[in-house]
Curated annotation (Swiss-Prot):
Keywords: Cell inner membrane, Cell membrane, Electron transport, Membrane, Translocase, Transmembrane, Transmembrane helix, Transport. The gene is rnfE. It comes from Vibrio vulnificus (strain YJ016). This is Ion-translocating oxidoreductase complex subunit E. The complex is composed of six subunits: RnfA, RnfB, RnfC, RnfD, RnfE and RnfG. PANTHER family: ELECTRON TRANSPORT COMPLEX PROTEIN RNFE (PTHR30586), ION-TRANSLOCATING OXIDOREDUCTASE COMPLEX SUBUNIT E (PTHR30586:SF0). The lineage of its organism: Bacteria, Pseudomonadati, Pseudomonadota, Gammaproteobacteria, Vibrionales.
Amino acid sequence: MSEHKKLLKNGMWDNNPALVQLLGLCPLLAVSSTVTNALGLGIATLLVLVGSNVTVSLIRNYVPKEIRIPVFVMIIASLVTCVQLLMNAYAYGLYLSLGIFIPLIVTNCIIIGRAEAYASKNDPLPAALDGFWMGMGMTTVLVVLGAMREIIGNGTLFDGADLLLGEWASALRIQVFQFDSSFLLALLPPGAFIGVGLLIALKNVIDTQLKARQPKQEKPAIERARVTNA
């Protein structure tokens, strides 16, 4: 398996940051009440992941090991500030909706973890691919969870998409069900915990089924040599 395919498989499935590593649960549970919020935070996290991985990889040979963590945090904080300013300028409604969870990306264990575990030990291109696929894995889980909660809670899909994509995206709104009132359990943190648990359980079931379908390799019987004298 090529390195690119291995990074893709790790980020999207085998070592998914949300479903396997269980990192970044605070924003995952708090922000994923709608697809728009989930996608906005996912894109922001992905950009910071790629940027921090590339930057850390470029300077990895010039930073003393004793101060590498503070340096990594400064790099991540700088990139998060840039993303926050861009979102404030071009997606102000979404910026207000996400609130404190944008600057909290600095403390996201996914980002500092990939910087320390992978980017600081590899060249810029593999580091960028690692950040991209880890970010895509996180974004995918965010969007799927956001879609589940939005449909069950409000009966809609892509509500408020214009906050992220512009006024033309208001046409993307889909009314799946018509509710007289919102189903608050799905929209509040308990619903997020239940949703994440269901997604983790589904992944485990799929992994078990895939493992069961793989042909079992029978180990050849090894005959023990006689070591005693006749």
